Amino acid sequence: MAFVKISEQPSLYNDLEKKSVGEILHDINTEVEKAIPQIEKLVIEIVSRMRRGGRIFYMGAGTSGRLGVLDASEIPPTFGMDPSWVIGIIAGGDIALRNPVENAEDDTEQGWKDLQAFGINDRDTVIGIAASGTTPYVIGAIKTARAHGILTAAITSNPDAPISEAADIAIEMIVGPEYVTGSSRMKSGTGQKMICNMITTTVMIQMGRVKGNKMVNMQLSNAKLVDRGTRMVVEELGLPYDEAKRLLLLHGSVKEAVDAYRKQ
């Protein structure tokens, strides 16, 4: 039986140009709740590896690749982790973030070569993102990584997709046909970003990068974040604002500032 890409079937919606803004936004919204058991399984496996120095690699082409790079790029400022802990790789290289690279996603061997450039090992995790579930670049990387004993996962919008069969853990987010037929940057892309957020946020919490509900390890990269961090220190220690700010800037993070003060 031929594999059918549900995500590329004709849209269930018509006359889109006649809909109100509210109707469009409501129609596009997608639930990912059914994927939580598989996401949980993946997070548990990732955390056990990261505690031994493992990393997360996102692999994708086009929109899927861009979303992986985006999620990876948000880890250092949000959680204060070195960029080497979560890495996004897109078919065609960084130029493909802004411009399409012809045939890049069709190369079944380049994905593994791109992973090898980072010295990938069996403590790492490779997460392939492909709405269609058929992207050769991603599937090739997943298959080879798995053959080398590396944990692999797939995020796709189609059931029983080839990428799901290739990976150890398959996260299938069945959003159905896209609102605009075949435009996987929409429902599939939105769901992919949400799942990536869920994975890395939960991993970072488990790795101790959050306290309570606060980003106590965030990078102090602008005035807004310095102010936010200062107010966290004020709340935690009861210090005057100026003293809390001085302490924060001295130690570089909310966590370090609070720990240093309490050790005095």
Describe the role of every protein-language-model region.
Residues V203-Q264:
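Short, amphipathic alpha-helical interaction segments embedded in low-complexity terminal/linker regions
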Residues P37, K41, P136, T190, ...:
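Charged, alpha-helix-enriched surfaces in structured cytosolic catalytic cores
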Residues K34-R49:
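A short, well-structured juxtamembrane/interface segment
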Residues V21-L25, T108, Q192, C196, ...:
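A general structural signal for well-ordered alpha-helical segments in protein cores
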Residues G54, I150, L239:
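Short glycine/serine/threonine/alanine-rich loop segments
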Residues H26-T30, G88-N99, K211, V226:
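Gly-rich Lys/Arg/Thr-decorated short loops/hinges at beta-loop-alpha junctions or inter-strand turns
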Residues F57-M194, V203-M207:
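Glycine-rich phosphate-binding loops that contact phosphosugars or nucleotide phosphates
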Residues M1-E31:
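Cofactor-/ligand-binding subdomain signature composed of acidic, glycine-rich
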